[in-house]
Structures are given as structure tokens and as C-alpha cells.
Amino acid sequence: MKALEIGNVKITSGFWKEYQELILKKVIPYQWDILNDKVKGIEKSHAIDNFRIAAGISNDKFYGEAYQDSDLYKWLEAVGNALQVENNIELEKKADEVIDLLEGAQEEDGYLNTYFQLVEPEKKWSNILECHELYCAGHLIEAAIAYYKGTGKDKILKIACKLADCINEKFGPEEWKMHGYPGHQELELALVKLYDLTNENKYLKLAEYFIDMRGTNQFFEEEFIKRKRICHWTKCKVEEPNRRYNQFPYQEYNQFHQPVRMQKKATGHAVRAVYMYTAMADLAYHNGDKELLDSCKSLWDNITNKQIYINGSIGSTPSGEAFTKDYDLPNDTNYSETCAALGTVSYTHLTLPTIRL
């Protein structure tokens, strides 16, 4: 049993209709203004301008973080979903213009990440743990799927597939490839969705590889040593000789402390966790993998019975935006990141039929 597509459901009144209208009429246009730095009093985004630079249209300098591209991709996904609900010529035109920028910025081999293209091109694929290359790719894929479903236009889908193929050439079990997995999970669930749309088995196999490899080697520690123990997020990017990515708390934070089939308790960064659990459950559904499904069920039981607030939020501590221990759900210091709540909704929406109790 799979969920209905957005375009196959029409909400006509009530609570959810009001929120749907709010998103369509107010939120998405406001986000467009933020992405174009038209909202006064807040830090600039520069996300769209970064793509203009990468496409050779602007001579400006990159601004933002290594994950800056994902903000634009998430907006494009929202537009794609909105266009499945109702037509909006103006919104579609804006999105098409952005997609043209993505096409112009993408490299010949499919690589697309404005931070590394513009700031540190020599360091591509050198910091998978911290720098969100694979995370951003996942959000582009999800945006492409939503936009294709909303418009029938396949330009962004071709861009996303080209990037996915680039990643597939870089990661995998073959001896000459990198034997790693995303630092911030997201790509895994996106690849399963891409398989569902294209029926290209290589995308399902790549998602399966990332899930199966997680927690089976010391990939993140090995790449950290290759970088001479320099952390991307440390001020001035200085050497951190005492940091060990093969020890607590870093393994738990990124959910590579155990192979995924052995994980029974939700731990670490809550957003990373539920994104990974979503991919696990979807893979279990596609492959008939009972062992993986049993792990998903145990994780679901742990979250819903012992690590979730009454309002459905998760990730109680601001330290690491993370799960802590069972029943540690304080009200006064509750963090419960919005992304974690959205991840829980996605996890539930996509996978509850698979792990039905």
C-alpha cells in the first residue's frame, strides 16, 4: 500500500485547506523574496545568485554555507508540489528560470554544488561527513520529482539524473570507487523516489549501497585523517588532533555507530535519523527485506513510545539537535527542530503502511 499523490487529493475546506492556501498564497512567494534577498532585516540568502555565478552569468562572489544550494532546492520542491494542487503561471515561470540556472551551472560530468564549484573546487568529495554534497543532491532530486509531477517538464529531472549518475560513478562497491555514505542522510530516500519515477534500478541499488555500508567501516575517520584532521566547521579550519570520528559521540550523532540492521534505538541528530529511517523502510518495502523492516519497526516503536513529545515533535536536546535517552522529554529545554518534525511526518507518510503494527 502506497500513499496517494498530492495531485490526486483535493482538500476543499477546514484546517488543512487553510494551511494549504497559506503556503500557496503567502509562504512560497515570501520564500522567493528571501532567496532573492528582497526581505529587509534578515541575513541575505544569495542562494540564487550563487547559481548565477556558477552559470557564468554573474561575476559576484559566493556567499553562504556548503549546504546553501539546498534552500533553493527545497523551494523548487514546494513549487512542484504546489503546482500539483493548482496551476500558477507566474510561479511556474520563476521556477523555470531557476531551472535554467541549474542547467547552466551543472558541470559536464553532472557535478552540481555551487560551494565547491566556486570556493574549493579542489576539495570536491573530500569531506562527505561535514559538507553536505550528497545531502544537497538529495534535495535536488526530490525537487525534480515534484516539479516533473507538477508540470510534466523534465529539464530539472534530467539535471537531477545527471547528478545522480555522477554520484553513482563515484560511490559503490567497486574497488575504484569511494566506499562511503552520506554524512547527512537525505540522498538515500531521494534515490528510492527517483527509482520509483524512472524505474532505473541503478538508483535503487545506490540507495541500498549507502544504507548497507553505513556503520560497517571507518570511512569518516579515514577521510578526516586524509584532511589532516581539519574540520570544515571549526573557525579558521584548524587541525583538531583530539577529534575522533570513530568514537562517541560522533558515531551516534551520525548514526554510523552500528550497521543499520542492528540499530534498534533512535539516537543522534534527529533529522539525520528520521531521513535515514524513511529510506530504510522504503527499501525494505521494495526489496522485501524482513531484517531491515524489523529494524525499522524497532526504531518506530522506540520513537513513538519513548522519545516523542505529545505534540509529535522529536529531538529534545539543543546539543546536537538530537535524541537523548528514553523518556528524557523536558518541557523547559525542549529543542524539537522543525526539520525533525517534518522528517517524522515524511517517515510516517511514506512508511507507516510498510511497518504497520
Where are these regions (language model features)?
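A conserved hydrophobic secondary-structure block that centers on an alpha-helix together
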Residues: 130-197
